[in-house]
A protein has these predicted regions:
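Solenoid-like repeat scaffolds
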Residues: 137-145, 168-178, 188-192, 201-211, ...
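TPR repeat positional signature
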Residues: 151, 179-180, 184, 216, ...
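Residue at a conserved register position within TPR or TPR-like alpha-solenoid repeats
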Residues: 158, 223, 255, 305, ...
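Compositionally biased, proline/threonine/alanine/serine-rich low-complexity intrinsically disordered stretches
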Residues: 33-150
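Structural motif corresponding to the intra-repeat A-B loop/turn of tetratricopeptide repeats
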Residues: 161, 226-227, 258, 308, ...
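Structural register within alpha-helical repeat arrays
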Residues: 154, 184-187, 219, 251, ...
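Catalytic glycan-binding domains that act on GlcNAc-containing polysaccharides
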Residues: 185-187, 200-201, 205, 372-375, ...
Length: 779
């Protein structure tokens, strides 16, 4: 049975992309191509950028291209792994989120603290500060290395609108190679039919340009849409497997054309089972390989789509499978939608399909949502253990986690442990979370430290990020203490303490009596090495974007560059550039990518340039400056224009109603637009609101942070359920872990660790105070 293809490590993905593209240059570019790398003959460079046609003059194809760019921006589609936090996009299969954060903010603030996050970047569409410029007067000098920012923004905007020919004409007026390379990269990113040959030519001409997964995706899409020859397709994939649905389909067609029927069939089955794509490509696959896919393949695709709430794909797959599978889709959707007809839909599933994984999952979720976790646990106990039958073990784990926590709330630790431990999570981050939950329940509620130690050891064997490494070691120490192994416990705490920027690393340091918080930084890149770094086209392009104020487009290039770099000194230099460009969001991204790989870029990961100076309001209790930085980093990554789907705005992600109440409390005028246009105004109101929360919760940092994220009403419920962490008889570490909203649980830990680091960044004399912070407001 075909299993989902394993993805390449991020550190290798871009190099494989470049190798695959360059390896095919001899085939793809056997004929001559234009100087700019286009498929069409190149036109002589113009002395000045050519005036673009008006939008009204666009062809139908160009209009469609522009509309498609707005609907599905390739930048927003990039999954950027920046933080061991998983951004869940919905209700987490029943666990209600505290609130909805902006796409970028959710990368840090939501869900699982061990998952590499899918970090969708903000839309990189750039609106020029002025109308797209006309051709300069012929008497003016041609654009030189000092690229005109307005003209650069104009050319970028043309590519973003799908006006490739107009963009090319403007690009040809630039003489700076960095500007030309930047604009070609923008054209490829925009996905406006640039073509395979042009994409390959760009990589050939710029072998050191941070490639990223998008260049590969664009090339694979073009291989299929341009119907490239089997020889070219196979040459392209000689060094790297396909990473997209179009790429897999193109390779399957090429394999079959060359007589490799078995390999082609295997590729089609892998495509069908592991990739998400729409009706059009589905029809092409079925038309090209009518006898390859079986009912088992269709059922697998249906199950995967159901677990992703992709009802249309699931319905089509059920139709291909035949039988009564459509009833499973109806039942699954009714349960997920919390329909009043869910029970009837489940009852309508034929008895022959009630052993199907999808039915078991839906039945368990229905019972759990009906506040019957014991019955849900009994149903989960009948679930198959074969990962290929479960299809997506991670989604199954999420349901198990929610049921286990509900059972724990009922005091049934034994069953909660059974539900948590009998899991089949697939990805490392979910396996870490599952093993942690099983170990934590065993240690703190089921009285079985020996079993807990085994689970925490499994976490340690998988963990790579500082947060996960520290969490594993800290809890190994707690288990060892419970077993009476004091020396072993100390060794585990010392291991956790080696991660000083992670929450559990800081808690371990406090437990060991360590009061320092050492932040690491590499040596500077100097001399000829620094000159060579600064001279790279991609680095010069980043400077051009920064000087033109195009931060939205600079961010993905910073991230691609940070992924490609392995020398800490070069990463430090990249961060220095982001600092020069006053781009704290890029600094956070660069720093996180570095520290996730164990590289010493702690300071860059916690920038101090993101908040302008301001005078605080005196009508509310004051909070320390480090706390404002800790919150802003978690809420918006210092993006002053950030807006969430539910309306939270600005640097501090304040809801307008909350901001208005706070403004009234401090007797200042309220202007909702200033939340996103005036970062100092938003920071002042955010700090004032934090002061209000400190007052509400009598100085408790834990309760204030939880309330900032989830609201005071939820915090009151959690105090009723789990006790008051301000009282001495409640273990505050456990209290935070018992927060039922995964987003808020993670949020409190991340803000608490941010606070410790920012104290050190803003005042190097500051001692580690996390133990006191966790117990503030104690009575």
């Amino acid at each position: 049975m075909i299993r989902p293809a394993a993805s390449h490590p991020a550190s290798k993905r871009t190099s494989l992309t470049a190798a695959a593209l360059v390896a095919t240059v001899g085939v793809a570019l056997a004929g001559s191509v234009g100087q700019a790398g286009t498929d069409a003959p190149a036109t002589p460079p113009a002395s000045q950028p050519t005036p673009p046609a008006s939008d009204a003059a666009l062809s139908t194809a160009q209009v469609r291209g522009a509309q498609a760019a707005k609907a599905a921006d390739p930048v927003a589609a990039d999954a950027l792994k920046l933080d061991p936090v998983h951004a869940s996009g919905g209700d987490d299969k029943g666990e209600e989120p505290a609130r909805t954060l902006p796409a970028a903010a959710s990368a840090y603030a939501s869900a699982d603290p061990d998952a590499p996050v899918a970090f969708p970047l903000p839309d990189a569409a750039v609106t020029p500060a002025a109308p797209v410029p006309e051709v300069p007067d012929p008497g003016r000098p041609k654009i030189s290395g000092d690229t005109d920012p307005t003209l650069l923004r104009g050319a970028i905007d043309l590519y973003r609108k799908g006006r490739v020919a107009d963009g090319d004409r403007m690009r040809d007026g630039f003489t700076d190679p960095a500007a030309k390379a930047l604009l070609e990269w923008v054209a490829i990113r925009a996905g406006a039919g640039i073509g395979f040959n042009r994409t390959v030519a760009f990589v050939r001409a710029n072998p050191d340009w941070p490639a990223g997964p998008l260049l590969r995706r664009r090339a694979e899409e073009a291989l299929l849409s341009e119907r490239k020859s089997p020889a070219l397709v196979r040459a392209y994939f000689a060094t790297a497997k396909p990473s997209s649905a179009p790429g897999k389909f193109a390779l399957a067609l090429a394999l079959r054309a060359d007589g490799c029927e078995t390999d082609a069939a295997e590729m089609v089955r892998d495509l069908w089972r592991t990739e998400s794509f729409g009706r059009s490509l589905e029809a092409k696959v079925l038309d090209a390989f009518p006898d390859t896919l079986t009912r088992v393949d269709h059922r697998y695709r249906m199950e995967r789509a159901l677990l992703k709430d992709d009802w249309e794909s699931a319905g089509r797959a059920a139709g291909y499978a035949g039988g009564g599978y459509a009833s499973l889709v109806r039942a699954r959707r009714a349960v997920e939608d919390k329909s009043s007809g869910a029970a009837a839909a489940l009852a309508a599933v034929p008895p022959s399909l009630r052993g199907d994984a999808s039915y078991i999952f839906s039945r368990a979720q229905y019972l759990r949502r009906a506040d019957k976790p014991e019955a849900a646990a009994a149903v989960l106990a009948t679930a198959p253990s074969n990962p290929d039958v479960l299809v997506d073990g991670d989604e199954w784990w999420i349901e198990r986690r929610i049921v286990a926590r509900k059972l724990l709330d009922l005091g049934d630790a034994k069953t909660a442990y059974a539900v948590a431990s009998q899991q089949a999570a697939r990805t490392p981050e979910k396996r870490i979370e599952a093993e942690f939950h099983a170990g934590w329940i065993a240690l703190r509620f089921a009285g079985d430290p020996a079993a807990a130690a085994q689970h925490f050891a499994r976490v340690a064997a998988i963990a790579e990020s500082p947060i996960s490494v520290a969490r594993a070691a800290y809890w190994q120490g707690r288990a060892a203490e419970a077993l009476g192994q004091s020396e072993e416990a100390k060794r585990f705490y010392e291991r956790a303490a080696l991660q000083p920027i992670a929450y559990y690393g800081q808690v371990a340091r406090a437990r060991l009596g360590q009061t320092s918080l050492p932040l690491r930084a590499p040596a500077d890149l100097e001399g000829a090495e620094r000159q060579a770094f600064d001279g790279r086209l991609s680095v010069r392009a980043l400077r051009l974007l920064g000087e033109a104020g195009i931060k939205e487009l600079a961010l993905p290039l910073y991230i691609d560059a940070a992924r490609d770099l392995s020398d800490p000194r070069e990463l430090q230099a990249l961060g220095d550039l982001a600092t020069d460009m006053k781009d704290p969001r890029a600094l956070v991204a660069i720093g996180k990518l570095a520290v996730q790989r164990g590289l010493p870029l702690d300071a860059h990961a916690y920038p101090t340039i993101g908040i302008p100076t301001y005078e605080t309001f005196t009508a509310v209790p004051q909070v320390e400056r480090a706390m404002v930085y800790a919150i802003a980093r978690q809420e918006s990554q210092f993006d002053p224009r950030a807006q969430s789907g539910v309306g939270a705005r600005g640097l501090m992600q304040m809801m307008p109603a909350t901001a208005q109440r706070t403004a009234r409390r401090v007797s200042t005028a309220f202007d909702v637009d200033r939340l996103t246009s005036d970062p100092a105004y938003c920071a002042k109101l955010g700090q004032a609101h934090l002061g209000e929360l400190m007052e509400d919760w009598r100085g408790s940092y834990v309760l204030a942070f939880a309330s900032y994220n989830a609201g005071g009403g939820n915090v009151k419920k959690w105090i009723d359920a789990y006790g008051d962490p301000r009282k001495g008889d409640v273990d505050v570490i456990d209290w935070v872990e018992r927060i039922p909203f995964t987003e808020t649980r993670n949020y409190v830990q991340r803000v608490m660790e941010n606070l410790q680091v920012y104290r050190s960044r803003l005042d190097s004399r500051s001692a580690l105070l996390i133990e006191g912070d966790l117990h503030r407001g104690a009575r």
